[in-house]
């Protein structure tokens, strides 16, 4: 009997040890703050959402939907916070990623805590704070919309947001020039100024240059995807259907889960072949992308030219003959105006803010057009 008890105790200790080791599985814990809608306001948010769900390197802890009231009804289109794409991907990957919406209206002052917002809109801030507080290790926060949810959380719990519980805040917003007010900053200028002046550990990935959001400079992350037909050839038909559903804004199909499981209607395949973002924005390219650099940095991925072709690979799998497309994170001094515009100066000393840099943006775009379809084509849903 004593031997059985000892064996049982050893088994419990072994299970406990295994359980503890699984907590630190090497994955990067991430909270995503995204201006995610359905139907999409910018389809890029819905397309890019597939990345953190798919990457083995990322543990997606929560999604906070950064909603702006004016976009819920715009040009005759009615939208809701993006619960549908979140539920679609949680279904496809067998996950239950918590999601909630944050306050819809701009800050009234840099110190605004938005405590008068409706209860539904409080849930996003509560989710953000709770997820940081309960995380086993420092979390990365990825913000791809306005900085309103971050500013509100910072105003409510500066002790938490400025603590070591937050590893890095990755901000996809702003312009590399102080002469252009970029979209995400313009959504809430007071929130942008509050966050960028906060002293949080921030990596900035500007979306625009002085020439606008569709220009390619060394300090912004925009690139254009020239072709979308590869989506129809994806080996995972359910992920293909997710992309088609969201790119085409299929609000005429309320069966958003069964759409993923059924054969793709030929009419939708034809519509995807005809889809071009430049019909709306007039700058060339069938799809516009601002977030790839963010997710590659978070997941420690690099863009290489391998045997003359672009590929996205983990840092540890770069081959001797690969030509790495150079990217850096510069430490910078940041001067932030009250309207959210900022100027930066590269510095050698320690700084809480780093700036994304790419040496050859046009070459990077060419390589990404070769690499991105293969990368997305490698993603697999869970059955």
Would you name each region that the model predicts?
Residues 15-17:
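C-terminal motif of bacterial Sec signal peptides marking the signal peptidase cleavage site
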Residues 2-9:
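Sec-dependent signal peptide recognition
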Residues 100, 170, 296:
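Residues in well-ordered beta-strands of folded domains
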Residues 72-134, 347-362, 366, 371-376, ...:
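Metal-dependent C-N hydrolase catalytic cores
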Residues 24-30, 47-62, 186, 190, ...:
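Conformational coupling and interaction surfaces
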Residues 19-20, 93:
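Long, soluble alpha-helical segments
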Residues 20-80, 109-225:
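Active-site histidine-anchored catalytic micro-motif
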